[in-house]
Swiss-Prot record:
HAMAP family, alphabetized: Lys_tRNA_synth_class2
Cell compartments where the protein resides: Cytoplasm
Annotated organism of origin: Campylobacter jejuni subsp. jejuni serotype O:2 (strain ATCC 700819 / NCTC 11168)
Sequence positions that bind Mg(2+) 1: E404, E411
Principal subcellular localisation of the protein: cytoplasm
Name under which the protein is recorded: Lysine--tRNA ligase
Length: 501
């Protein structure tokens, strides 16, 4: 650990500082203000003749990003969470003894606490003239080379802390993410929704069609499943008497990783008694309008080279109409299982003959429609067979009162009128078991306790989930989900695998 020559040199400097009575890792160093506050508060000197105010004695802190020694003085650039600032100090300003120590031991990457006044250099740069410079933290590992930075994408994800040090834009993206979550939370609170927390470990893998992570509870001696979705617990709360609830939290799916999938991801799910899925679509449009406004993005934004128009209302189109309009498929084909199988095979797609019509229509949708839905589009009235928790349409028993929101070829939200008929729900679970036996690994398990909860009576309810990660990708114009997750899942390095062996 820390065994290369540059790291060893820095360790020696840390030891030298200790020998001089200077702790390279001190505590209780308190800064007065951020660098942004310093710039804003003292910008008035730019309008003055002398362009300095020596009556100020402000304390700031930051990481050294640049260091330039010019004879008896040092110019440095420090950076904190928000911005950067040039600092200047010399033998005269900090004293010859301290200056000599700093000149020898300060390095790029170190964190310093600086006290001084604002001034403008001869080259016109707003700066801080330091009277005191204290080492706050000695960095042992050198930062990547300035002009090339940390450009290897794998290293950026594996060492996010270095990525954040070197790339200001990365920090800004995660500030946006934090703001998005905060805005969503306040949006639902202002609508009268109650924020709740439900279990992360489930006795049954349910709430969505996906493959779960399995763990074991030693004390109870039973398997547990990291939650795929919180849906069934949130609906139990509606049964219990709450009428509007939401949860922002992690979900886990033991599936592949790609540009839009990470094994653990963040969602918001919300359930609203005495409302329907049309109300949810209206609410979703309102939420997007709020986010775009608060993030100063306007009604049209760019994502992956495409311009997306968020003007209301969003397009609403039935599942089957989307297959025809965007997929270019004939109406008679999408209603015929054999024709669908022939079409899929002819175009080189996998086609499981055991799947029923609704699942095959979903194969058509995934392969011919989804990527063509660029502007916000609500696809409504899904096949009932792929909607095991949705209410069945009164007008067509093969259709679920369900929608998904697609933007730029990606699903962003899924919502529906909740199935509250316990007998129908029980039969749907049985169908899911049949699907699992036919080879569908993602089919839901039977959850008799949930069916029993419905037996006590759940009021007419609409529920929806929105993927926070994909939403942030959209709002920050990021192509990969790993760009909006602080510490995304990564394949183990060969060295890590060898250690386990």
């Amino acid at each position: 650990m820390f065994d290369n020559i540059l790291e060893q040199q820095r360790i020696e400097k840390a030891k030298e500082l200790k020998n001089l009575g200077i702790n390279p890792y001190p505590h209780f160093l308190e800064k007065e203000m951020s660098l942004k506050t310093f710039k804003d508060k003292f910008s008035y000197i730019l309008e003055q003749v002398e362009k300095r105010d020596e009556s100020v004695n402000a304390v700031v802190a930051g990481r050294l990003k640049l260091l330039r020694i010019a004879g008896k003085s040092i110019f440095a650039n420090i950076e904190d969470e928000d911005t950067n600032l040039q600092i200047y100090f010399s033998k005269d300003s900090v004293g010859e003894e301290l200056y000599t120590i700093l000149k020898k031991n300060l390095e790029v990457g170190d964190i310093v606490l600086v006290k001084g006044f604002p001034f403008v250099t001869k080259t016109g740069e707003f700066s801080l003239h330091a009277s005191e410079v204290k080492l706050a933290t000695k960095a042992i590992v050198p930062l990547p080379e300035k002009y090339h930075g940390l450009t290897d994408i794998e290293q950026r994800y594996r060492k996010r802390y270095v990525d954040m040090i070197m790339n200001v834009e990365v920090r800004k993206d995660f500030l946006v993410r934090s703001k998005v979550v905060s805005l969503i939370r306040h949006f639902f609170e202002n609508k009268g929704f109650l924020e709740v927390e439900t279990p992360m470990m489930h006795p049954i893998a349910g709430g969505a069609n996906a493959k779960p992570f399995v763990t074991f509870h030693n004390s109870l001696g039973v398997e547990r499943f990291l939650r795929i979705a919180p849906e069934l617990y949130l609906k139990r709360l509606i049964v219990g008497g709450f009428e509007a609830v939401f949860e922002i939290n992690r979900c886990f799916r033991n599936e592949g990783m790609d540009l839009t999938h990470n094994p653990e991801f963040t969602t918001i799910e919300f359930y609203w008694a005495y409302h329907n899925y049309k109300d949810l679509m209206d609410l979703t449009e309102e939420l997007f309008a709020l986010l775009l406004d608060k993030l100063n993005l306007g009604k049209t934004i760019e994502f992956d080279g495409k311009m997306i128009n968020f003007s209301k209302p969003f397009e609403r189109i039935t599942y089957k109409d989307a297959l025809c309009k965007y997929g270019g498929l004939d109406r008679d084909l999408i209603e015929d299982k054999e024709k669908i199988l022939t079409k899929l095979k002819a175009d080189g797609f996998e086609a499981n003959e055991k799947l029923e019509l609704g699942h095959l229509q979903a194969e058509l949708f995934d392969n011919y429609v989804e990527e063509k839905l660029i502007n916000p589009t609500f696809v409504i009235d899904f096949p009932i067979s792929i909607s095991p928790l949705s209410r069945r349409s009164d007008e067509d028993s093969q259709i679920a009162e369900r929608f998904e929101l697609f933007i730029c070829g990606r699903e962003l939200a899924n919502g529906f009128n909740e199935l509250n008929d316990p007998l129908d729900q029980y039969e749907r679970f049985l169908k899911q078991i049949e699907a699992k036996n036919a080879g569908d690994e993602e089919a839901c398990e039977m959850d008799e306790d949930f069916v029993n909860a419905l037996g006590y009576g759940m009021p007419p309810t609409a529920g929806q989930g929105i993927g926070i990660d994909r939403l942030v990708m959209l709002l920050t114009n990021k192509k990969s989900i790993r760009d909006v997750i602080l510490f995304p899942a990564m394949r183990p390095l060969k060295s890590e695998l060898k250690e386990k062996e």
